[in-house]
Amino acid sequence: MLSPLIQSTLLMTLGLGTLVTFSSTSWILAWIGLEINTIAIIPLMAKTHHPRSIEATTKYFIAQSAGSATLLVTACLAAWHSGNWAISPSSDPIILNAMTLALMFKLGMAPMHFWLPEVMAGLDLTTGMILATWQKLAPITLLIQIAQDQNNAFILGPALLSVFVGGWGGLNQTQTRKIIAYSSIAHMGWIASMAPFNPTITWVTTLIYCLLTSTTFINLNTLKANKITALTMNKHNQISQMLLLLLLLSLGGLPPLTGFTNKLLASVELANQNLVIYLFMMMMGSLLSLFFYTRMCYLSIILSPPCPTTNLTLWRVTPNKPMALMTMLSINLFILTPQLMAIFIMY
């Protein structure tokens, strides 16, 4: 295990890497920020010294190295072609397509998604939360910047495939971390489909996804639920079980919960772009994700053993105000969608 000082230093380094990518105006600085992120999370992934975590760390390092190498080569070609390192869409479609593929690979989007479920399965829930949320922000920033002049079909195709792969891959899974990994793939599809059209909606959906996923991971960690079967064995923390049910339905995009906001904003934007058939296929793919979320809720609540009044139930739990705030936003933020959009458009 890592000491608190080293762990705090690594977490601050993670934040530094993301901020470097956010504030960079050249490809070389953006690449450095991505590498700082990768180097900082590797000790966090391998801190348990378990063979599964070491295997997951190795797979993650190889996958991210391949994506970073591709991005660096294409950035060098773009700089040679344009004469500067500025982050701007290249006039060469081959270079632009290679950059997009490299960023999709780092995000774990289909068809370059194979590393993400295996890596997530070997991590603890806390590190998995960082991998599924914070590590997505820097690549999404770069993808938004180059997607405006990208061929829409080159982004919309992998986005649709990610929605179907994320829904289909999660059907036969029993580990909660793998289920969240496939959920992440599906959500990345919805987020990427907005990047060529509306950066504001893309960022709103990204932040909502990070909020929902973080809250779900924290709740699963509270219940010590690494597998679906563990959801039926917790007799004493019924409040967390009820909250987990609502969080899972929100992740599935069931109205009127917060997760429906992402589907609604994306649907309106795609309809405005006259992509009705594409939107219909995205909706059909999201039903697969909703199915396995509903299955988890079924196992969590309906199949739980009876809890008579003689059981020692932890109704008087220790107050946790940050967790309460995150859960409330993850469930009830949908009603504040107009105000949220107004704030993002203003700033």
Curated annotation (Swiss-Prot):
Domain of life: Eukaryota
Entry GO terms, CC: mitochondrial inner membrane
Subcellular location: Mitochondrion inner membrane
Transmembrane segments: 2-22, 26-46, 60-80, 94-114, 127-147, 151-171, 179-197, 201-223, 242-262, 274-294, 325-345
Keywords: Electron transport, Membrane, Mitochondrion, Mitochondrion inner membrane, NAD, Respiratory chain, Translocase, Transmembrane, Transmembrane helix, Transport, Ubiquinone
Topological relation to the membrane, as annotated: Multi-pass membrane protein
Biological processes per GO annotation: mitochondrial electron transport, NADH to ubiquinone
GO molecular function: NADH dehydrogenase (ubiquinone) activity
Any Pfam family the entry gives: Proton_antipo_M
EC number of this enzyme: 7.1.1.2
Tagged with keyword ATP-binding: no
Catalysed reaction, written as an equation: a ubiquinone + NADH + 5 H(+)(in) = a ubiquinol + NAD(+) + 4 H(+)(out)
InterPro entries: Complex_I_Subunit_2 (IPR050175), NADH_UbQ_OxRdtase_chain2 (IPR003917), ND/Mrp_TM (IPR001750)
PANTHER family named among the record's database cross-references: NADH-UBIQUINONE OXIDOREDUCTASE CHAIN 2
Protein family according to the UniProt entry: Belongs to the complex I subunit 2 family.
Functional note: Core subunit of the mitochondrial membrane respiratory chain NADH dehydrogenase (Complex I) that is believed to belong to the minimal assembly required for catalysis. Complex I functions in the transfer of electrons from NADH to the respiratory chain. The immediate electron acceptor for the enzyme is believed to be ubiquinone.
Protein name as annotated: NADH-ubiquinone oxidoreductase chain 2
Protein source organism: Lampetra fluviatilis (European river lamprey)
